[in-house]
Amino acid sequence: MQIAKVRGTVVSTQKDPSLRGVKLLLLQLVDEEGNLLQKYEVAADNSVGAGFDEWVLISRGSAARQLLGNEQRPVDAAVVAIIDTIHVEDRLIYSKKDQYR
């Protein structure tokens, strides 16, 4: 799994029929220290409802397809959780509550 920040949405009017109704998000990956990386990825969000600027947890591969309920969907990554806090040892790396203060 990987931590990422939602940077936007991806809209496509022409797509594989199995992706109809699936929200696609543009994510910026985050390292273990909470730093934004210069790497982006598109992930499906079929159940979590993540929004702009939220930090999320993504799963890849067959686990992502299982989450979406259709292992035949052409999906490499899926959002599995919206992150509330991240602690590393005794340090708070991220807090959703403090994000907009």
UniProtKB/Swiss-Prot annotation:
Matches recorded under SUPFAM superfamilies: EutN/CcmL-like (SSF159133)
CC annotations in GO: carboxysome
PROSITE patterns, per the entry: BMV
GO biological process: carbon fixation; photosynthesis
Domain BMV residues, every copy: 1-84
Subcellular localization(s) per the UniProt record: Carboxysome
Record Pfam families: EutN_CcmL
Gene3D superfamilies: EutN/Ccml
InterPro entries: CcmL (IPR046387), EutN_CcmL (IPR004992), EutN_CcmL_sf (IPR036677)
Main location as per UniProt: other
Alphabetical keyword list: Bacterial microcompartment, Carbon dioxide fixation, Carboxysome, Photosynthesis
UniProt GO molecular function: structural constituent of carboxysome shell
Function field: Probably forms vertices in the carboxysome, a polyhedral inclusion where RuBisCO (ribulose bisphosphate carboxylase, rbcL-rbcS) is sequestered. Has been modeled to induce curvature upon insertion into an otherwise flat hexagonal molecular layer of CcmK subunits.
PANTHER family given in the database record: BACTERIAL MICROCOMPARTMENT SHELL VERTEX PROTEIN EUTN, ETHANOLAMINE UTILIZATION PROTEIN EUTN
Subunit structure: Homopentamer. Interacts with full-length CcmM.
The family this protein is said to belong to: Belongs to the CcmL/EutN family. CcmL subfamily.
Record's comment describing the protein's domains: The tight homopentamer forms a pore with an opening of about 5 Angstroms in diameter which opens into a wider tunnel at the base of the truncated pyramid. The pore is positively charged.
Protein name: Carboxysome shell vertex protein CcmL
